[in-house]
């Protein structure tokens, strides 16, 4: 074997354009953190579901890529997007169709084996699958119509609202939560009936925020895995028996997205699509609503928030200035925020790595402020 040939080929690669090294570091880091939490906190069982979901997710994703190619489920890149994204056209999409069900199956199996199965898990499973199906319809229309536009915004919001209302009715009828919102320390604010419309807004906002974040290779899957891990650790630290099943749900979701990340990092071999991103956001919101971790989710999900707010600012300022002075003004080069940095000339992998690092910092902050 000509080792010199392979060594020279490796040296010639631009590692800044390959997200594998940092993805492996992220996976190892989350595994190490899970080991530490399991060692120092009684009843913590994060490592087994994490490792299991990473391995199974990676295997299923590799198999799924082949299946998605066979049925021609490939990404369509919008013409008005960054020019560097045209090379992503044709990449298999709808990867979330494998990851979400697998993570839910594993979560419920772990819950049954540990005698922690609960109605909360049923509600979360319903919410995740329902939002996955909405994303699936959206992705399928986009793929079959050969354009980066599936369901209309109105149709998507209506479907998300219907599912959100069903979820909220379910948790209300089963008395699975209260209307208090925990903020700093043990301070709470009771919202009473106002909690329910706010909860519905959070479901829609979070699912669409993760959807907006899914615009760079490995960005949403990495950030999502970090936030799920943070929520799992916070729930374990609380020491409430009712939260252990949800903590298992969170760490299994984290593992599933980490397994997916192996193939979703730059250069991506598969995208999660709306099928995955909507389910991810809905799951995060559902966990926060059921476990009173809304404040923590707001802090941990700072990147999701920033991406969403950047779009609101961009559209709002553009429409307002166009109405007042006849010419629309853009605050950012392009929204969501990650596209702004792309057009500034920052490499995709650098943007993703920095957004991951910011998420890690804010996850640590949220846990310390609990």
UniProtKB/Swiss-Prot annotation:
Q: What is its EC number?
A: 2.7.8.13
One Gene Ontology molecular-function label? phospho-N-acetylmuramoyl-pentapeptide-transferase activity
**GO-annotated biological processes:** cell division; cell wall organization; peptidoglycan biosynthetic process; regulation of cell shape
Membrane topology classification? Multi-pass membrane protein
Q: Which UniProt keywords apply?
A: Cell cycle, Cell division, Cell inner membrane, Cell membrane, Cell shape, Cell wall biogenesis/degradation, Magnesium, Membrane, Metal-binding, Peptidoglycan synthesis, Transferase, Transmembrane, Transmembrane helix
Query: Which InterPro entries does this entry report, sorted A to Z?
Result: Glycosyl_transferase_4, PNAcMuramoyl-5peptid_Trfase, PNAcMuramoyl-5peptid_Trfase_CS
GO CC field: plasma membrane
Where is it chiefly localized? Answer: membrane
Q: Provide the leader sequence positions.
A: none
Q: Where in the cell is it found?
A: Cell inner membrane
Q: In which pathway does it act?
A: Cell wall biogenesis; peptidoglycan biosynthesis
Q: Give the required cofactors.
A: Mg(2+)
Reactions catalysed, semicolon-separated, are: UDP-N-acetyl-alpha-D-muramoyl-L-alanyl-gamma-D-glutamyl-meso-2,6-diaminopimeloyl-D-alanyl-D-alanine + di-trans,octa-cis-undecaprenyl phosphate = di-trans,octa-cis-undecaprenyl diphospho-N-acetyl-alpha-D-muramoyl-L-alanyl-D-glutamyl-meso-2,6-diaminopimeloyl-D-alanyl-D-alanine + UMP
Which major enzyme category is it? Answer: transferase
The regions listed as transmembrane in this protein's record are 21-41, 46-66, 92-112, 117-137, 151-171, 181-201, 217-237, 243-263, 270-290, 298-318, 349-369
Family, similarity comment: Belongs to the glycosyltransferase 4 family. MraY subfamily.
Family annotation (NCBIfam families): mraY (TIGR00445)
Q: Describe the task this protein carries out.
A: Catalyzes the initial step of the lipid cycle reactions in the biosynthesis of the cell wall peptidoglycan: transfers peptidoglycan precursor phospho-MurNAc-pentapeptide from UDP-MurNAc-pentapeptide onto the lipid carrier undecaprenyl phosphate, yielding undecaprenyl-pyrophosphoryl-MurNAc-pentapeptide, known as lipid I.
Fetch the PANTHER family from UniProt: PHOSPHO-N-ACETYLMURAMOYL-PENTAPEPTIDE-TRANSFERASE (PTHR22926), PHOSPHO-N-ACETYLMURAMOYL-PENTAPEPTIDE-TRANSFERASE HOMOLOG (PTHR22926:SF5)
Q: What is this protein called?
A: Phospho-N-acetylmuramoyl-pentapeptide-transferase
Gene of origin?
mraY
